[in-house]
UniProtKB/Swiss-Prot annotation:
One of its GO terms (biological process) is DNA repair. It comes from the Eukaryota. CDD domains: RPA1_DBD_A (cd04474), RPA1_DBD_B (cd04475), RPA1_DBD_C (cd04476), RPA1N (cd04477). Belongs to the replication factor A protein 1 family. PANTHER family: REPLICATION FACTOR A 1, RFA1 (PTHR23273), REPLICATION PROTEIN A 70 KDA DNA-BINDING SUBUNIT C (PTHR23273:SF76). It comes from Arabidopsis thaliana (Mouse-ear cress). A zinc finger (C4-type) spans 602-628. This is Replication protein A 70 kDa DNA-binding subunit C. Heterotrimer of RPA1, RPA2 and RPA3 (canonical replication protein A complex). Pfam families: Rep-A_N, Rep_fac-A_C, REPA_OB_2, tRNA_anti-codon. GO terms for cellular component: nucleus.
Amino acid sequence: MAVSLTEGVVMKMLNGEVTSETDMMPVLQVTELKLIQSKLHQNQESSNRYKFLLSDGTDLAAGMLNTSLNSLVNQGTIQLGSVIRLTHYICNLIQTRRIVVIMQLEVIVEKCNIIGNPKEPGHSSINPQRGGVNTQSNGGSEQQQARRSDVNGGRYGVSANSPQPQVVHNSSDAGRYCVSANSPQPQVVHSSSDAGRYGVSANSPQRQVVHNSPDAGRYGQPQVSQRYGTGSGYPETSPSTRPYVSSNAGYGGSRQDQPRAPTATTAYSRPVQSAYQPQQPPMYVNRGPVARNEAPPRINPIAALNPYQGRWTIKVRVTSKADLRRFNNPRGEGKLFSFDLLDADGGEIRVTCFNDAVDQFFDKIVVGNVYLISRGNLKPAQKNFNHLPNDYEIHLDSASTIQPCEDDGTIPRYHFHFRNIGDIENMENNSTTDVIGIVSSISPTVAIMRKNLTEVQKRSLQLKDMSGRSVEVTMWGNFCNAEGQKLQNLCDSGVFPVLALKAGRIGEFNGKQVSTIGASQFFIEPDFPEARELRQWYEREGRNAHFTSISREFSGVGRQEVRKVIAQIKDEKLGTSEKPDWITVCATISFMKVENFCYTACPIMNGDRPCSKKVTNNGDGTWRCEKCDKCVDECDYRYILQIQLQDHTDLTWATAFQEAGEEIMGMSAKDLYYVKYENQDEEKFEDIIRSVAFTKYIFKLKIKEETYSDEQRVKATVVKAEKLNYSSNTRFMLEAIDKLKIGDANSLPIKAESSNYRSDAFNSGVGTSGTRDTASVDARREFGLPAANQVGQYGNQYSSDARSLGGFTSCNVCRSNSHVSANCPTLMSEPQGQYMGGTNAGGGMPRQHVGSY
C-alpha cells in the first residue's frame, strides 16, 4: 500500500518547532532499532528500553520508546521499516541533542521498504527560547541572535582572553544555508571555563586555523552556514585590531551591528587564500546506515579488566562449563549458567549468564574452544561460588557478543595452581586448591542421604605425593560414576594412576580432606610436566615409601548403616534430640490406610523440581496452587501412604511420600488413583494392595519428634524402601554374628514367648540372671539387636567381664569354637541350676526361641 510520511517534520522537531502531539501527530518510519539495557538491573524486563531512528523520508531523528510499549517490539508489531503515527510524544533536549520520547503510537504498516533516502542532519545551533537556529538578516548586515556558551572552548588551548584564531571552514555544505563558501567568515570566539586546559597560556597569541574537513561542525567546530556571536561582547572587527574584552561581557555588554569586512585577513594582514575544494559530504548526509567497522578489535588481557572500562574485548579459551540451573526468588523464576575463561597471559575469570542470555549463549559455548567476548558487565566476584583468583566476574546480557574464532596455540588449555599435600594441612577450611598425586586406594560408591531426603553418591580415595603425605579425596555425585569407575579399574589392574584435581575444596570433617565441588575437574594420567615428574618419582622410590596421612582415618565406604529394630525407636528415644535420627529396619507392612493414599499436587516447576504443594479444585476444571499463586489445567498426584511396619520386636506407623511410595507400590500415584476413582475397579485396586501387604522390606527411616496441636509426637518417615533380598540380608546377619562372637549366648537376638519370659541366655526358673556382659549389650544396640534382658529395658547397667575382652570364642564355659554356651555339653551333663560365672547354681536351662531378623 502507498504510504506517505510527514515531510519536513524531523527538521521541525530538531529546531524546536514541533515538541509534542499538540503541535502535530506526524507519520514516520522506523529505520533503526536497538535494545538498551540498564547495567544496574539487567534481570528486570522493565529496565529494557528500545532506541531507534525515525525518518520522514528526508531526515532522521533519534527516538526512545516508553517501556510500556516494549511488548510491541517483542511481538514483532514494531520492526525495521514499520510506519507509525505518533499520538503521544515529547521532544526532549538531552546534551544539545533532540530525543523523541514516544508514550503512545499507532502502527500503520508493520513492515515496509525504506522510503526515500533519509539522512541524519548536521550540527545546528540552539535557540535559547526554542533550541533552534535563528539567523536574521537586515539590510545586508547580519545580527547574531544566538548566545552560545561553550564550556569546551578552551579544550584545544584557546584562552578566553587570548587573541583568537581566525577560523576558515571550507566545506561542500557551505552553501546549505545560502552562505557562499568563499565569502568572508566571521571570527569565532568560544567563551570557556577550561581555557588553557591543554597547556596554552591564556595570553599567548594564537595561530590561524583553517578547517578543510567535511565533518566541520560535528565535534564542536562551527560550519560556515552557522552564524555565531563572538561571545565576548565586542563588535566584529578585523582580527588584528579586535579589542580584548572579558569573556563575561557577552552576558551584559552592548552588542552593535558591524559591517562585515570586505576581505578576510590573517593575523599577519595577508589575504586568506580560498581553500575550497570539492569535499565528500558530512557523515550520515545523503547516506544510509553507517557501515560496520571491520577493523580487528583491540584485545585486552583479563588481568586488566575493571568495572570502569567502557569497551573491551578479550580472546579466551573456555576451560569449564557448568550445567544449566534454575532458581526461584521473590522476583520470580530464572535460570543461569556459568563458564570459566583463560587467556594467553594466564588470566582467569568466570562468566555468568542469566535468563535471556542463557538462551542466547548456552548452546554456543563449547569447552576447549576459543572466543572473542566483549560488551559484558564486570561485577565483584562472589567468592562463595567462584574459586578463580580474580576479584571480578563477567555478567553477559543480550547486548554482549561472543564470536568464535580459530584455535590459538598461545592460549593454554588448562592452568593449574598446584599445592603439595603437605601444604594442605595448614590451609584454611573451605578454601579451594589444585592438587596432584598418585592414587593409592579407592573405595566403592555408597549412597548418602541429604537433609532434603534425596540421595547423593559418594566415593573416597587416597592421594599421595612427593611431600611424604597423603590425603583423603571425596568424590560426590557424577564424579563417582565416570571418573571414579575409571580410577577403580586402574587400581584393580595394579596401575596406580596420576590424578590431578582442579578446584577441590578443603574440609576438616575427618582431619584435612579434599572434596569435589560443582566446578571441580579430574585429569587422569594427564600429560604435562608435573604429572611426568610425579610418575618418575613413584616408579623410582615412591612405590615403597612411607606416607603420613593428614586425614585422621580413611573413611572408605563412609558411615555404615545404623541397623535397628522397631522396639529400639521407643527404647532408645530416637528422634527426641535436636537432629533427626536416620536408621534402617527390616520390617513387614502389616497394614495400610487406603482412604487417602495420595493428594493433588502442583505440577509447576520450581527450579529443577516441581512445586508439589497441595492444589484445590476451582470447580471449573482448573486447579489453584496457593504457593505459586497460579492456576493449572491439570494437577499431579503424589503418594502420602500411611503404613504400619512390624518386626519381631514391635510395630510402628510410618509415612511414605512420592518416591518411597512408588518403590513400595510399584506404580505411580496417578495410575493407582485412576484405577480406584476413574475406572472404579475396586477388585484390581484390592489386588494391588494385597500384593504389598505382608511383604518384607528394608526401610530407611527418618525419625523426628514433631509437634501436633501442642502435643509432641515421634514421626517416622520412609526415605527409601527396598524389597528384602534374602541373600544379601543373610550375609549381613552372618557378618553381625561374627562381630558378636566376643560375647556369650546373650549376643543372639532373643524373642520372648510370654510376658514372664526372661530373655537372658542363662536364668533359672526361680533365680536371677547372671552378670551381664557390657560388650554384648553395646554390640546388640550397634547392629540393631534387642538387648539381652527384657526388650525395652535399658540403662546404666554396665559391669565389665574379663571374658568379653578375650579371644574369638563362642562358648564361655569350655572355650570351644564348635558351639555356643547355651548348647555346651558341660552344662548339659551337669545338674540343672543357676549358672553364674561358670558354675551351675540351680534351676534349669529355659527354652529359647531365636527370633527372625
